[in-house]
């Protein structure tokens, strides 16, 4: 009996503990590293094609290695609702009959009624605001910029990690060298937390078991 109570107590404590959840990895998202081939030029000349800036340019990113500031303006909202109702009623009555010339005092009635009323709703809303500076990784043949960047904030009780990658049109970059995240094609934005604060918001293993699809109740 004592062993059973001890096991029950340990299981109850395990449901309250915070076990580290699997975190998404921060791989390079299949983006190759920046590789800029040096332009051929004369040695000792005043003009260098690699580091030269045009007098008519406005400082916007346009070549591998340039930085670009992305303004995060992500808002998603989804909702779903379903209502189902149906019913069925049935009645049957048996009146007195005649058997062998005599009236049988048999009178009865039956009735059945079934109703179903079910409904469900689901909603989700996410908002992400902020800024992150990325680096131009590659310039495609059509002038599309392939960018990627990472920002890590180390706090006293954890760590916040943000990563962004995608493709940017040069025409969408403003004169301040900024672009909205809504204008990034194939955008992959990751924002996760690590540490004590993130672990405190995670359910224990026993709680996750009771909330899993394996529970028949």
UniProtKB/Swiss-Prot annotation:
GO MF assignments: cytoskeletal motor activity
PROSITE patterns: PROKAR_LIPOPROTEIN
Topological relation to the membrane, as annotated: Lipid-anchor
Keyword Cell division: no
GO cellular component labels: bacterial-type flagellum basal body, distal rod, L ring; cell outer membrane
Signal recorded as keyword: yes
Lipid addition sites, S-diacylglycerol cysteine: 16
GO biological process, one term: bacterial-type flagellum-dependent cell motility
InterPro entries named among the record's database cross-references: Flag_Lring
N-palmitoyl cysteine-type lipidated residues: 16
Family to which this protein belongs: Belongs to the FlgH family.
Oligomer status and interactors: The basal body constitutes a major portion of the flagellar organelle and consists of four rings (L,P,S, and M) mounted on a central rod.
Name used for this protein in its record: Flagellar L-ring protein 2
Source lineage: Bacteria, Pseudomonadati, Pseudomonadota, Betaproteobacteria, Burkholderiales
């Amino acid at each position: 009996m004592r062993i059973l109570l001890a096991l029950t107590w340990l299981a109850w404590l395990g449901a309250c503990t915070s076990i580290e959840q699997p975190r998404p990895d921060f791989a390079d998202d299949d983006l190759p590293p920046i590789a800029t081939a040096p332009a051929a030029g004369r040695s000792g000349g005043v003009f260098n094609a690699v580091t030269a800036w045009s007098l008519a340019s406005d400082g916007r990113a346009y070549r591998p290695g340039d930085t670009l500031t992305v303004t995060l303006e992500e808002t998603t909202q989804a909702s779903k609702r379903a209502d189902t109702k149906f019913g069925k009623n049935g009645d049957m009555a048996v009146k007195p009959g005649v058997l062998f010339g005599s009236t049988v005092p048999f009178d009865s009635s039956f009735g059945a009624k079934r109703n179903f009323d079910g409904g469900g709703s689901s909603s989700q809303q996410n908002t992400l605001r902020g800024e992150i500076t990325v680096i131009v990784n590659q310039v495609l043949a059509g002038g599309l910029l392939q960018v990627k960047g990472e920002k890590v904030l180390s706090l006293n009780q954890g760590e916040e990690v943000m990563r962004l990658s995608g493709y940017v049109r040069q025409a969408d970059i403003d004169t301040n060298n900024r672009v909205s995240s809504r204008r990034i094609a194939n955008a992959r934005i990751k924002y996760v937390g690590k540490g004590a604060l993130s672990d405190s918001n995670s359910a224990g293993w026993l709680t996750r078991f009771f909330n899993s699809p394996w529970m028949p109740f």
